[in-house]
């Protein structure tokens, strides 16, 4: 603690001379915070730390307000050759805070966003069979994830920014006592992924206004009571062309046909054969770099679920397995590259890509779609826009 001019100790009931000031308060610019000793400082910590939390929240809100008011759009990567017409809208608003009372995954406060529990399981092909309690935990979290996506869906229209959608997603998560799983996952800066047009996946929400004719994928994962629930849908922004409708419709059909095949005894590698057959029959290609995955207490784990044909995925479906299927289907070639942000995956030829995702539980006779929409007989939102 730093030495300062003489003040009175701020610990309740203590009026001793105070010459020490909280170093965090100095850093945050908080006035006061004087204590007579380390003991008094530690004794006041439970209430004193709330000042730090409020100051950080106020700072984040001020930075976000200033960022929006300035409406500055800077190209973060001068000289980078974009594959399509989409551009990032920088600077990004600051990373949002999650209330301390909400349970957090192990990577939430890691400086690199690293999940130690996932790293421990890295490389294993052993697929966890969930027990009844774990299955119920997954049902609950997937229902919450679906609620959050449905809220985001209502915001999709021309003129809205993906940053505004991310803000709504963040608030919807915390209102449900959920941590938004993408936030700080390997330092991802936002609470959901928003992928527009040629973006395949992992798009970072920013202040670009959605435009009439865009297609937008919103990918939601939430963490609740120790479990992750994951799903995504692609939406039409206003009126879209027939090519966009065909792409999105086919992508959804690829997912649902693959889901129809899920049951005990099916090899995970078979899913890619089903998906690619339907995609190619409609003149589209299947992304190979990104796959579905096991999910439960870990965000990403075994099995690995490729969406392309003749893959070498390991494993046979058994009751109690929980995993995602999330095909990414492209108008042109399947090849991808990543923007310099290290996250945004785009088609190499700049043509559009669409995606849909569900989290599934293998049952004794088939599967349960844990992230199924409750309204409209479970149909995806875009179907009401056709």
From Swiss-Prot:
A GO cellular component entry from the record: cytosol
Keyword field: Aminopeptidase, Cytoplasm, Hydrolase, Metal-binding, Protease, Zinc, Zinc-finger
Zinc finger (C6H2-type) residue numbers: 6-59
Catalytic activity: Release of N-terminal amino acids, preferentially methionine, from peptides and arylamides
One function term, GO molecular function aspect: metalloaminopeptidase activity
CDD domains named among the record's database cross-references: MetAP1
EC number from the UniProt entry: 3.4.11.18
Gene Ontology biological process terms in this record: intracellular zinc ion homeostasis; protein processing
Names of required cofactors: Zn(2+); Co(2+); Mn(2+); Fe(2+)
EC primary class: hydrolase
Main location: cytoplasm
Record-listed Zn(2+) 2 binding positions: 22, 25, 48, 52
Entry-linked InterPro entries: Creatinase/aminopeptidase-like, Pept_M24, Pept_M24_MAP, Pept_M24A_MAP1, Zfn-C6H2
Cofactor detail note: Binds 2 divalent metal cations per subunit. Has a high-affinity and a low affinity metal-binding site. The true nature of the physiological cofactor is under debate. The enzyme is active with zinc, cobalt, manganese or divalent iron ions. Has high activity with zinc; zinc cofactor is transferred into the active site region by the ZNG1 zinc chaperone.
Binding site for Zn(2+) 4: 230, 293, 326, 357
Binding annotation for a protein: 202, 300
Binding locations of Zn(2+) 1: 9, 14, 36, 40
Record's subunit section: Associates with the 60S ribosomal subunit of the 80S translational complex.
Family recorded in the similarity comment: Belongs to the peptidase M24A family. Methionine aminopeptidase type 1 subfamily.
NCBIfam families noted in UniProt: met_pdase_I
Entry function: Cotranslationally removes the N-terminal methionine from nascent proteins. The N-terminal methionine is often cleaved when the second residue in the primary sequence is small and uncharged (Met-Ala-, Cys, Gly, Pro, Ser, Thr, or Val).
Protein name per its UniProtKB record: Methionine aminopeptidase 1
């Amino acid at each position: 603690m730093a030495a300062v001019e003489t003040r009175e100790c701020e610990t309740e009931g203590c009026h001793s001379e105070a010459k020490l000031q909280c170093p965090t308060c100095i850093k945050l610019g908080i006035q006061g915070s004087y204590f007579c000793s380390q003991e008094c400082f530690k004794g006041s910590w439970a209430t004193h730390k709330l000042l730090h939390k409020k100051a950080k929240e106020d700072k984040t809100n001020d930075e976000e307000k200033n960022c929006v008011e300035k409406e500055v759009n800077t190209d973060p990567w001068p000289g980078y050759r974009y594959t399509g017409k989409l551009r990032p809208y920088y600077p990004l608003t600051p990373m949002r805070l999650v209330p301390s009372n909400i349970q957090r995954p192990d990577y939430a406060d890691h400086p690199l966003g690293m999940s130690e529990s996932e790293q421990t399981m890295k490389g294993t092909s052993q697929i966890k069979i969930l027990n009844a309690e774990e299955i119920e935990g997954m049902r609950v979290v997937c229902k919450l994830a679906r609620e959050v996506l449905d809220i985001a869906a209502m915001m999709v229209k021309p003129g809205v920014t993906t940053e505004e959608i991310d803000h709504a997603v963040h608030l919807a998560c915390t209102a449900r006592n959920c941590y938004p799983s993408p936030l700080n996952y390997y330092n991802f800066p936002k609470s959901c992924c928003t992928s527009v047009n040629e973006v395949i996946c992992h798009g970072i929400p920013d202040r670009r206004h959605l435009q009439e004719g865009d297609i937008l994928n919103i990918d939601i994962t939430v963490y609740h009571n120790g479990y992750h629930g994951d799903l995504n849908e692609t939406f039409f922004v206003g009126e879209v062309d027939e090519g966009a409708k065909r792409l999105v419709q086919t992508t959804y059909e690829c997912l649902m046909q693959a889901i129809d095949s899920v049951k005990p005894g099916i090899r995970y590698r078979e899913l890619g054969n089903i998906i690619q057959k339907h995609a190619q029959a409609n003149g589209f290609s299947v992304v190979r770099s990104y796959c579905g995955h096991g999910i439960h207490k870990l965000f990403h784990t075994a099995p690995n679920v490729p969406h392309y044909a003749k893959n070498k995925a390991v494993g046979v479906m058994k009751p109690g397995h929980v995993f995602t299927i999330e095909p990414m289907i492209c108008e042109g070639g399947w090849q991808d590259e990543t923007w310099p942000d290290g996250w945004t995956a785009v088609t190499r030829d700049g043509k559009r890509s669409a995606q849909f995702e569900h989290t599934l539980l293998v049952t004794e006779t088939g599967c349960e779609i844990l992230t199924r929409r409750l309204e409209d007989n479970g149909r995806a939102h875009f179907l009401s826009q056709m």
